[in-house]
Amino acid sequence: MTNSDWMPTASISQLKQRATLLRQIREFFAERNVLEVETPAMSHATVTDIHLHTFKTEFVGPGYAKGSALHLMTSPEFHMKRLLAAGSGCIYQLGKAFRNEENGRYHNPEFTMLEWYRIGFDHHALMDEMDALLQLVLRCGSAERMTYQEAFLNVLGVCPLEEEMRELKQVAATLGLSDIAEPEEDRDTLLQLLFSIGIEPKIGQITPAFVYDFPASQAALAKINPADPRVADRFEVYFKGIELANGFHELDNPAEQLARFKADNAKRLEMGLTEQPIDYHLIAALEAGLPECAGVALGIDRLIMLALGEDHIDKVTAFPFPRA
Protein backbone atom coordinates (compact mmCIF):
# COMPACT_ATOMS: atom_id res chain seq x y z
CA MET A 1 0.00 0.00 0.00
CA THR A 2 1.23 3.49 -0.88
CA ASN A 3 0.41 6.78 0.81
CA SER A 4 -2.09 7.60 -1.97
CA ASP A 5 -4.03 4.32 -1.90
CA TRP A 6 -6.69 5.88 0.31
CA MET A 7 -7.63 8.23 -2.54
CA PRO A 8 -10.48 7.55 -4.98
CA THR A 9 -9.36 6.38 -8.42
CA ALA A 10 -11.85 8.72 -10.10
CA SER A 11 -11.40 12.47 -9.90
CA ILE A 12 -13.99 14.49 -8.00
CA SER A 13 -14.89 16.13 -11.32
CA GLN A 14 -15.65 12.73 -12.88
CA LEU A 15 -17.68 11.67 -9.85
CA LYS A 16 -19.77 14.83 -10.18
CA GLN A 17 -20.35 14.07 -13.86
CA ARG A 18 -21.29 10.51 -12.90
CA ALA A 19 -23.89 11.89 -10.49
CA THR A 20 -25.29 14.10 -13.26
CA LEU A 21 -25.65 11.12 -15.60
CA LEU A 22 -27.37 9.05 -12.91
CA ARG A 23 -29.80 11.91 -12.36
CA GLN A 24 -30.51 12.03 -16.12
CA ILE A 25 -31.23 8.30 -16.11
CA ARG A 26 -33.68 8.66 -13.22
CA GLU A 27 -35.38 11.57 -15.00
CA PHE A 28 -35.65 9.44 -18.16
CA PHE A 29 -37.70 6.84 -16.28
CA ALA A 30 -39.67 9.38 -14.24
CA GLU A 31 -40.86 10.97 -17.50
CA ARG A 32 -42.12 7.53 -18.58
CA ASN A 33 -43.83 6.78 -15.25
CA VAL A 34 -41.54 3.84 -14.51
CA LEU A 35 -41.32 3.21 -10.76
CA GLU A 36 -37.93 3.04 -9.04
CA VAL A 37 -37.67 0.07 -6.66
CA GLU A 38 -35.14 -1.47 -4.28
CA THR A 39 -34.68 -5.20 -3.77
CA PRO A 40 -32.34 -7.29 -1.58
CA ALA A 41 -28.62 -7.47 -2.26
CA MET A 42 -28.58 -10.93 -0.61
CA SER A 43 -30.79 -13.94 -1.21
CA HIS A 44 -31.18 -17.55 -0.11
CA ALA A 45 -31.30 -18.58 -3.79
CA THR A 46 -29.20 -17.48 -6.73
CA VAL A 47 -28.56 -17.88 -10.45
CA THR A 48 -27.88 -21.30 -11.91
CA ASP A 49 -26.14 -19.99 -15.06
CA ILE A 50 -22.89 -21.94 -15.57
CA HIS A 51 -21.08 -18.76 -16.62
CA LEU A 52 -21.87 -16.76 -13.46
CA HIS A 53 -20.02 -17.12 -10.16
CA THR A 54 -21.48 -15.74 -6.95
CA PHE A 55 -20.21 -14.47 -3.62
CA LYS A 56 -21.54 -16.54 -0.73
CA THR A 57 -21.88 -15.54 2.90
CA GLU A 58 -23.75 -16.78 5.98
CA PHE A 59 -26.20 -15.30 8.45
CA VAL A 60 -25.54 -16.47 12.01
CA GLY A 61 -27.93 -14.28 13.98
CA PRO A 62 -30.42 -15.39 16.67
CA GLY A 63 -32.33 -18.48 15.62
CA TYR A 64 -29.72 -19.46 13.05
CA ALA A 65 -27.04 -21.09 15.17
CA LYS A 66 -26.10 -23.40 12.30
CA GLY A 67 -26.01 -20.50 9.89
CA SER A 68 -28.17 -19.66 6.89
CA ALA A 69 -26.40 -19.51 3.52
CA LEU A 70 -26.85 -16.33 1.49
CA HIS A 71 -25.66 -15.23 -1.94
CA LEU A 72 -24.90 -11.69 -3.06
CA MET A 73 -27.10 -11.02 -6.07
CA THR A 74 -25.60 -11.04 -9.57
CA SER A 75 -28.70 -9.15 -10.73
CA PRO A 76 -31.97 -7.97 -9.15
CA GLU A 77 -33.93 -9.87 -11.82
CA PHE A 78 -35.59 -12.54 -9.67
CA HIS A 79 -36.82 -10.12 -7.01
CA MET A 80 -38.01 -7.60 -9.59
CA LYS A 81 -40.07 -10.25 -11.37
CA ARG A 82 -41.72 -11.07 -8.06
CA LEU A 83 -42.71 -7.39 -7.81
CA LEU A 84 -44.07 -7.49 -11.37
CA ALA A 85 -46.17 -10.55 -10.54
CA ALA A 86 -47.45 -8.73 -7.42
CA GLY A 87 -48.77 -5.86 -9.55
CA SER A 88 -46.01 -3.24 -9.35
CA GLY A 89 -46.38 -2.07 -12.93
CA CYS A 90 -43.31 -1.01 -14.93
CA ILE A 91 -40.23 -0.78 -12.70
CA TYR A 92 -36.52 0.02 -12.73
CA GLN A 93 -33.64 -0.26 -10.28
CA LEU A 94 -30.23 1.38 -10.00
CA GLY A 95 -28.12 -0.56 -7.55
CA LYS A 96 -25.18 -2.79 -6.82
CA ALA A 97 -24.64 -6.26 -8.25
CA PHE A 98 -21.87 -8.72 -7.40
CA ARG A 99 -20.00 -11.31 -9.45
CA ASN A 100 -17.09 -13.37 -8.17
CA GLU A 101 -15.25 -13.30 -11.46
CA GLU A 102 -12.97 -10.75 -13.10
CA ASN A 103 -11.34 -7.52 -11.97
CA GLY A 104 -9.85 -5.24 -14.57
CA ARG A 105 -10.46 -2.63 -17.24
CA TYR A 106 -14.15 -3.40 -17.72
CA HIS A 107 -14.87 -5.51 -14.62
CA ASN A 108 -15.16 -4.98 -10.89
CA PRO A 109 -16.55 -7.65 -8.51
CA GLU A 110 -19.02 -5.04 -7.19
CA PHE A 111 -20.60 -2.88 -9.86
CA THR A 112 -23.60 -0.67 -10.55
CA MET A 113 -26.42 -2.10 -12.64
CA LEU A 114 -29.50 -0.52 -14.16
CA GLU A 115 -32.28 -3.03 -14.70
CA TRP A 116 -35.78 -2.27 -15.92
CA TYR A 117 -38.97 -4.05 -16.97
CA ARG A 118 -41.70 -2.77 -19.28
CA ILE A 119 -45.12 -4.41 -19.22
CA GLY A 120 -46.63 -4.94 -22.65
CA PHE A 121 -43.26 -4.63 -24.41
CA ASP A 122 -41.49 -7.30 -26.42
CA HIS A 123 -37.72 -7.21 -26.89
CA HIS A 124 -38.00 -5.04 -30.01
CA ALA A 125 -40.00 -2.35 -28.20
CA LEU A 126 -37.50 -2.46 -25.35
CA MET A 127 -34.63 -2.04 -27.81
CA ASP A 128 -36.37 1.12 -29.05
CA GLU A 129 -36.50 2.51 -25.51
CA MET A 130 -32.92 1.53 -24.75
CA ASP A 131 -31.80 3.20 -27.97
CA ALA A 132 -33.37 6.44 -26.74
CA LEU A 133 -31.60 6.14 -23.37
CA LEU A 134 -28.23 5.45 -25.01
CA GLN A 135 -28.61 8.45 -27.30
CA LEU A 136 -29.32 10.61 -24.24
CA VAL A 137 -26.39 9.39 -22.14
CA LEU A 138 -23.79 8.71 -24.84
CA ARG A 139 -24.86 11.53 -27.17
CA CYS A 140 -24.59 9.11 -30.06
CA GLY A 141 -26.65 8.29 -33.13
CA SER A 142 -29.35 5.65 -33.35
CA ALA A 143 -28.09 2.10 -32.88
CA GLU A 144 -27.62 -0.41 -35.67
CA ARG A 145 -29.46 -3.72 -35.36
CA MET A 146 -28.66 -7.20 -36.57
CA THR A 147 -29.63 -10.74 -35.70
CA TYR A 148 -27.09 -13.06 -34.11
CA GLN A 149 -27.15 -15.05 -37.34
CA GLU A 150 -26.51 -11.92 -39.45
CA ALA A 151 -23.58 -10.93 -37.22
CA PHE A 152 -21.88 -14.30 -37.77
CA LEU A 153 -22.61 -14.39 -41.50
CA ASN A 154 -21.51 -10.79 -42.14
CA VAL A 155 -18.33 -10.86 -40.04
CA LEU A 156 -17.19 -14.50 -40.02
CA GLY A 157 -19.04 -15.94 -43.01
CA VAL A 158 -20.51 -18.82 -41.02
CA CYS A 159 -24.04 -19.62 -39.81
CA PRO A 160 -24.14 -20.12 -36.02
CA LEU A 161 -27.45 -21.97 -36.19
CA GLU A 162 -26.61 -24.56 -38.84
CA GLU A 163 -22.85 -25.14 -39.12
CA GLU A 164 -21.32 -28.25 -37.58
CA MET A 165 -18.78 -27.99 -34.76
CA ARG A 166 -16.06 -28.90 -37.24
CA GLU A 167 -16.73 -25.80 -39.36
CA LEU A 168 -16.95 -23.58 -36.29
CA LYS A 169 -13.56 -24.83 -35.10
CA GLN A 170 -12.10 -24.08 -38.53
CA VAL A 171 -13.28 -20.48 -38.18
CA ALA A 172 -11.72 -20.38 -34.72
CA ALA A 173 -8.44 -21.54 -36.26
CA THR A 174 -8.45 -18.57 -38.66
CA LEU A 175 -8.72 -16.33 -35.58
CA GLY A 176 -5.74 -18.03 -33.94
CA LEU A 177 -7.92 -19.80 -31.39
CA SER A 178 -7.18 -23.44 -32.21
CA ASP A 179 -5.65 -24.23 -28.82
CA ILE A 180 -8.85 -23.16 -27.07
CA ALA A 181 -11.38 -24.30 -29.66
CA GLU A 182 -10.14 -27.77 -30.59
CA PRO A 183 -10.76 -29.48 -27.22
CA GLU A 184 -14.08 -27.65 -26.71
CA GLU A 185 -17.14 -29.90 -26.86
CA ASP A 186 -19.85 -27.42 -25.89
CA ARG A 187 -21.35 -25.64 -28.90
CA ASP A 188 -22.49 -22.54 -27.03
CA THR A 189 -19.10 -22.05 -25.40
CA LEU A 190 -17.50 -22.21 -28.85
CA LEU A 191 -20.03 -19.76 -30.29
CA GLN A 192 -19.42 -17.36 -27.42
CA LEU A 193 -15.68 -17.56 -28.05
CA LEU A 194 -16.13 -16.77 -31.74
CA PHE A 195 -18.52 -13.93 -30.94
CA SER A 196 -16.34 -12.28 -28.30
CA ILE A 197 -13.09 -12.50 -30.28
CA GLY A 198 -14.28 -12.36 -33.87
CA ILE A 199 -17.40 -10.19 -33.82
CA GLU A 200 -17.54 -7.87 -30.79
CA PRO A 201 -14.52 -5.76 -31.87
CA LYS A 202 -16.05 -5.19 -35.31
CA ILE A 203 -19.58 -4.05 -34.50
CA GLY A 204 -20.96 -0.95 -32.80
CA GLN A 205 -17.93 1.22 -33.42
CA ILE A 206 -19.72 4.38 -34.59
CA THR A 207 -23.07 3.86 -32.88
CA PRO A 208 -24.18 1.10 -30.49
CA ALA A 209 -25.10 -2.27 -31.98
CA PHE A 210 -28.09 -4.36 -30.93
CA VAL A 211 -27.69 -8.08 -31.61
CA TYR A 212 -30.88 -10.11 -31.20
CA ASP A 213 -32.38 -13.57 -31.77
CA PHE A 214 -29.69 -15.54 -29.94
CA PRO A 215 -29.67 -19.35 -30.27
CA ALA A 216 -32.45 -21.02 -28.28
CA SER A 217 -29.79 -22.89 -26.29
CA GLN A 218 -28.70 -19.47 -24.94
CA ALA A 219 -32.22 -18.36 -24.00
CA ALA A 220 -31.53 -18.06 -20.24
CA LEU A 221 -34.75 -16.39 -19.01
CA ALA A 222 -36.06 -15.36 -22.45
CA LYS A 223 -38.94 -16.75 -24.47
CA ILE A 224 -38.27 -18.98 -27.46
CA ASN A 225 -39.25 -17.19 -30.68
CA PRO A 226 -42.58 -18.68 -31.83
CA ALA A 227 -41.83 -17.95 -35.50
CA ASP A 228 -38.38 -19.57 -35.38
CA PRO A 229 -37.83 -21.97 -32.47
CA ARG A 230 -34.11 -22.09 -33.27
CA VAL A 231 -33.74 -18.69 -31.60
CA ALA A 232 -34.72 -16.91 -28.39
CA ASP A 233 -36.21 -13.44 -27.90
CA ARG A 234 -32.98 -12.16 -26.37
CA PHE A 235 -30.72 -9.23 -27.27
CA GLU A 236 -27.37 -7.79 -26.25
CA VAL A 237 -25.92 -4.32 -26.78
CA TYR A 238 -22.34 -3.47 -27.77
CA PHE A 239 -20.50 -0.19 -28.22
CA LYS A 240 -16.84 0.29 -29.11
CA GLY A 241 -16.06 -3.37 -28.42
CA ILE A 242 -17.73 -3.41 -25.00
CA GLU A 243 -20.82 -5.37 -23.98
CA LEU A 244 -23.25 -2.99 -22.28
CA ALA A 245 -26.54 -4.81 -21.82
CA ASN A 246 -28.48 -8.05 -21.99
CA GLY A 247 -32.26 -8.12 -22.47
CA PHE A 248 -35.13 -10.58 -22.81
CA HIS A 249 -38.72 -10.87 -23.88
CA GLU A 250 -39.32 -12.47 -20.51
CA LEU A 251 -40.22 -16.12 -20.12
CA ASP A 252 -43.48 -16.44 -18.15
CA ASN A 253 -43.88 -20.23 -18.16
CA PRO A 254 -43.02 -21.57 -14.66
CA ALA A 255 -42.57 -25.19 -15.74
CA GLU A 256 -40.20 -24.26 -18.54
CA GLN A 257 -38.24 -21.90 -16.30
CA LEU A 258 -37.85 -24.55 -13.60
CA ALA A 259 -36.71 -27.08 -16.21
CA ARG A 260 -34.06 -24.62 -17.41
CA PHE A 261 -32.80 -24.06 -13.87
CA LYS A 262 -32.56 -27.81 -13.29
CA ALA A 263 -30.78 -28.31 -16.62
CA ASP A 264 -28.28 -25.60 -15.63
CA ASN A 265 -27.59 -27.35 -12.33
CA ALA A 266 -27.14 -30.70 -14.06
CA LYS A 267 -24.61 -29.10 -16.38
CA ARG A 268 -22.86 -27.46 -13.43
CA LEU A 269 -22.39 -30.85 -11.81
CA GLU A 270 -21.04 -32.30 -15.07
CA MET A 271 -18.50 -29.47 -15.17
CA GLY A 272 -17.44 -29.97 -11.56
CA LEU A 273 -19.15 -26.76 -10.41
CA THR A 274 -21.30 -26.31 -7.32
CA GLU A 275 -25.03 -26.89 -7.71
CA GLN A 276 -26.90 -23.66 -6.95
CA PRO A 277 -30.10 -23.26 -4.87
CA ILE A 278 -33.04 -22.65 -7.21
CA ASP A 279 -35.24 -19.62 -6.51
CA TYR A 280 -38.61 -21.24 -5.90
CA HIS A 281 -40.05 -17.87 -4.89
CA LEU A 282 -39.53 -16.83 -8.51
CA ILE A 283 -41.20 -20.01 -9.76
CA ALA A 284 -44.17 -19.31 -7.45
CA ALA A 285 -44.37 -15.76 -8.82
CA LEU A 286 -44.46 -17.11 -12.38
CA GLU A 287 -47.20 -19.53 -11.34
CA ALA A 288 -49.17 -16.60 -9.90
CA GLY A 289 -48.77 -14.81 -13.23
CA LEU A 290 -45.95 -12.68 -14.62
CA PRO A 291 -47.41 -10.00 -16.90
CA GLU A 292 -46.27 -9.99 -20.52
CA CYS A 293 -43.09 -7.93 -20.39
CA ALA A 294 -39.53 -7.35 -21.53
CA GLY A 295 -36.56 -6.53 -19.33
CA VAL A 296 -32.92 -5.56 -19.65
CA ALA A 297 -29.82 -5.18 -17.46
CA LEU A 298 -27.30 -2.44 -18.30
CA GLY A 299 -23.81 -2.01 -16.84
CA ILE A 300 -23.69 1.56 -15.54
CA ASP A 301 -19.95 1.78 -14.86
CA ARG A 302 -19.16 0.83 -18.45
CA LEU A 303 -21.84 3.18 -19.78
CA ILE A 304 -20.48 6.13 -17.80
CA MET A 305 -16.91 5.25 -18.79
CA LEU A 306 -17.92 5.51 -22.46
CA ALA A 307 -20.01 8.64 -21.89
CA LEU A 308 -17.07 10.45 -20.27
CA GLY A 309 -14.52 9.25 -22.82
CA GLU A 310 -12.48 7.20 -20.36
CA ASP A 311 -10.73 3.88 -21.04
CA HIS A 312 -11.04 2.17 -17.63
CA ILE A 313 -13.96 1.87 -15.22
CA ASP A 314 -11.62 2.78 -12.35
CA LYS A 315 -11.67 6.34 -13.72
CA VAL A 316 -15.42 6.65 -13.13
CA THR A 317 -15.75 4.71 -9.84
CA ALA A 318 -14.55 5.98 -6.48
CA PHE A 319 -13.08 2.87 -4.87
CA PRO A 320 -12.70 -0.21 -7.11
CA PHE A 321 -11.78 -3.62 -5.72
CA PRO A 322 -8.06 -2.98 -4.94
CA ARG A 323 -8.99 0.08 -2.83
CA ALA A 324 -12.32 -1.10 -1.41
UniProtKB/Swiss-Prot annotation:
TM helices/strands, residue ranges: none
Cited Pfam families: tRNA-synt_2
Key words, A-Z: ATP-binding, Ligase, Nucleotide-binding
Binding site residues for substrate: S75, P76, E77, Y117, E250
Top-level EC class as recorded in UniProt: ligase
GO molecular function: acid-ammonia (or amide) ligase activity; ATP binding; lysine-tRNA ligase activity; tRNA binding
InterPro entries in the cross-refs: Aa-tRNA-synt_II, aa-tRNA-synth_II, aa-tRNA-synth_II/BPL/LPL, EpmA, Lys-tRNA-synth_II_C
The protein's name: Elongation factor P--(R)-beta-lysine ligase
Gene: epmA
